[in-house]
Amino acid sequence: MSLIHRYQNNGYNIVLDINSGCIHVVDEVTYEVLPYMEEGLDTAAIVGKLGDQFSEEDIKTSVAECEKLKADGMLFTRDVYENAIDTFTKNRQTVVKALCLHIAHDCNLACRYCFAEEGEYHGRRALMSFKVGKKALDFLIANSGSRHNLEVDFFGGEPLMNWQVVKDLVAYGREQEKIHNKKFRFTLTTNGVLLNDEVMEFCNKEMGNVVLSIDGRKEVHDFMRPFRKGAGSYDLIFPKFQKFAESRNQDKYYVRGTFTHHNLDFSQDVLHLADLGFKQISVEPVVADPSEEYALREEDLPKIMEEYDLLAKEMIKREKEGKGFKFFHFMIDLTGGPCVYKRLSGCGSGTEYLAVTPWGDFYPCHQFVGEEEYLMGNVDEGITRPDIQKEFGCCNVYTKPACKDCFARFYCSGGCAANGYHAHKDIRSNYEIGCELQRKRVECAIMIKAALAED
């Protein structure tokens, strides 16, 4: 298993020291020297290998500099985390930090790619009652231990179809904060159909983040996100989303889209949203059954990779022109970020994070809702399947065979358990197309950092 990852992008020779996280932008000599150093060749042998390409002096200088970086723990560092994560997993006390409240298993759109089947999640249409939501918040408080900051996402379906209950639960949460010394961060995901000034005003006061669903260009959005009778939704929601983003000072929100086989030129959708003034953008690859006509295929990968490269270059250009924006999948923290245990074990689904259905059932996350083998309990009885919690708690990059040799493992934390389950019926497996795209996004994100660091 290599300890470094080398790649070339946009004219940069980039070397990632996988286990330390150090990034090196190197010259041609060093780029070619490094593989031989990792093989264990000495300076003389490397000169013999590369002497017809570079001068002996340049090769010796490069080797000496790399040896210094190695001695300083910045190159060819070893993985010291496998035993540590095992100990951490066995000894940590699980606390619940976040809930995804399915406030509405109903929707007013009929999006073609919806994993929730128009909000029904393979079941019945339903709205969460205040009573069930209250019990969910009580469960979160009771199972959060000493943790002060808690998160609750209002999700659907379409949450605004049950707006009064959203408001009532926020009010209840604020009351409980004072009693239990907790702080709730509420978030909301909406398709915008029912968005109005009253909703915006409430969200700007109470919601730490809002996710606004829009796929990009009008023709793309209207094809994938129509009303049930077939009409498009772009013209209705777009001006409302613009107003909402401005009312939040272009912060603490995302416009979030999905690209599919039908719009492989998705960089144009990202740039369309940026041109309309949005500063916080996420356009993500669809995850779908391969039989769906909109599903991404292996043969789509070269085009998708090309699009990520195009987008990265355009983002650098716009940033230098003072017209920059954030793209969620290119956001990477090279100086701080989560602790190593978080980076190795992922999002916390099934342990620190749970989804709650309208009738109060617990699942590991929203993408497992309806999968009865992963029904974990309910708001009345609590967790009745601790074995599921344990199964998810033991899920990390070292228990996923495909992750052990992947250079991006400290950035993706092993990927999405639901994607692995839906691809191979195993939460420790990986969705291969998703892994390929994740690696590409990490490469682009690092390249952007390198390019902007030059100025």
Feature annotation, model-predicted:
Residues 40-51:
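Short acidic, hydrophobic short linear motifs in intrinsically disordered regions
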Residues 1-37:
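Acidic, low-complexity/disordered tracts enriched in E/D and polar residues
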Residues 133, 137-153, 162-286:
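Radical SAM/AdoMet-radical enzyme domain recognition
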Residues 219, 223-235, 242, 246-349, ...:
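Radical SAM enzyme [4Fe-4S]-AdoMet core and its adjacent flexible, acidic
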Residues 302-336, 366-413:
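C-terminal accessory region of radical SAM enzymes
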Residues 137-155, 392-394, 429-455:
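Short Fe-S-cluster ligation motifs
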Residues 394-444:
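Cysteine-cluster motifs in flexible loop/terminal segments that predominantly coordinate metals
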Residues 53-54, 60-61, 65-72, 76-79, ...:
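Conserved alpha-helical substructure of the radical SAM core
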